[in-house]
Amino acid sequence: MRCLGIESSCDETALAIVDDGRLVDAVMSTQAELHALFGGVVPELASREHYRLIGRMFDSLMLRCGLGVQDIDVISVARGPGLLGSLLVGVGFAKGLALAGGQRLVGVNHLHAHLLAAGLEHRLVFPALGVLVSGGHTHLYRIDSPRNFTLVGRTLDDAAGEAFDKVAKMLNLPYPGGRFIDVLGHMADPDDSMFPRPYTDNDNLDFSFSGLKTAVSTWLKAHGGTALAAPPAESELQAMLQNNVLPSGMPADMPLVCASFNAAVADTLYIKARRALQRLGGRGQIRSVVVAGGVAANSRVRTSMQRLAAEEGLHLHLPSPALCTDNGAMIAYTGWLLASEGLHHSLELETMPRGRVIPDDYIYDAH
């Protein structure tokens, strides 16, 4: 079964083809440089860029794969959560293809797809604890199958990825700033007493990162001159990412701030994920840990999750960094998994922007 996946939930336009669970090819275009001018994603600009790019990217993907529309069996698309205008572009395009070619249409939960994407590299083992850490969400799930997700913990305010971007902005680093904080964090040893492990002195499974963001802001104000005076030039950014070369004029304390912030986020995720495993019955009830989302590309977060899985004696599904950020492969793979179970949607499929509950409204077809 060959499945086309379409992702347009935020500021990446991405398409991919999965054939019987294996990735055939993928294309992706990011709008990060465009939105960096505004310090964050501008929804209207994002949807216009998706509309401008999606058709030509589809043509390019099909040409690269040597396929026609008639060679696709299933069309899957991210239906939410995300930005409404962006989602409408992807869902509208998917519906048009399905209507013209007669393929089955599968609407995919973007968050679930992040967690299932690890299955492209290694067979997933269920039941699993899902740890989703992205720019808009920090969620803990019990996952029993590709269709059955139970939310057990979530952020009450800022998501971890949002905290990374806001701290990067405080330091005058470019948007999105998580990768720069990660690289700078390797240039110093963290001070575990510098920043709190927020919202861990309780017995629940929810997160709150607003206090950590405030703690960083307070520290920076008390230690003036820690942030860059101006954003680095592109050449300096590339030197930092590729060769660990500090930008000119970087304050001496900046790597320490990044290392300590990285450690605070990673420790918080470790504490809550370990607590979730205990609540869900531990090794006797949970067989693996799945970590996903853009922040899962952070090296310290990856190390903390590796430690957790090793301590608990569980399989760890940690996708490669390319599969952590928004991509078409995760949508295609999830669509293939669901279609393999006989699940699909009608052409009345609704988009579900952030804030709306995505219903389990699949149509079951035994054939």
Curated annotation (Swiss-Prot):
It catalyses: L-threonylcarbamoyladenylate + adenosine(37) in tRNA = N(6)-L-threonylcarbamoyladenosine(37) in tRNA + AMP + H(+). Substrate binds at L132, V133, S134, G135, G136, D165, G178, D182, N298. Pfam families: TsaD (PF00814). It comes from Oleidesulfovibrio alaskensis (strain ATCC BAA-1058 / DSM 17464 / G20). The lineage of its organism: Bacteria, Pseudomonadati, Thermodesulfobacteriota, Desulfovibrionia, Desulfovibrionales. GO terms for biological process: tRNA threonylcarbamoyladenosine modification. Keywords: Acyltransferase, Cytoplasm, Iron, Metal-binding, Transferase, tRNA processing. InterPro entries: ATPase_NBD, Gcp-like_dom, KAE1/TsaD, TsaD. Its EC number is 2.3.1.234. Signal peptide: none annotated. One of its GO terms (cellular component) is cytoplasm. Belongs to the KAE1 / TsaD family. Fe cation binds at H110, H114, D326. Binds 1 Fe(2+) ion per subunit. The keyword Transcription does not apply. GO terms for molecular function: iron ion binding; N(6)-L-threonylcarbamoyladenine synthase activity. Its cofactor is Fe(2+). This is tRNA N6-adenosine threonylcarbamoyltransferase. Required for the formation of a threonylcarbamoyl group on adenosine at position 37 (t(6)A37) in tRNAs that read codons beginning with adenine. Is involved in the transfer of the threonylcarbamoyl moiety of threonylcarbamoyl-AMP (TC-AMP) to the N6 group of A37, together with TsaE and TsaB. TsaD likely plays a direct catalytic role in this reaction. It is found in: Cytoplasm.
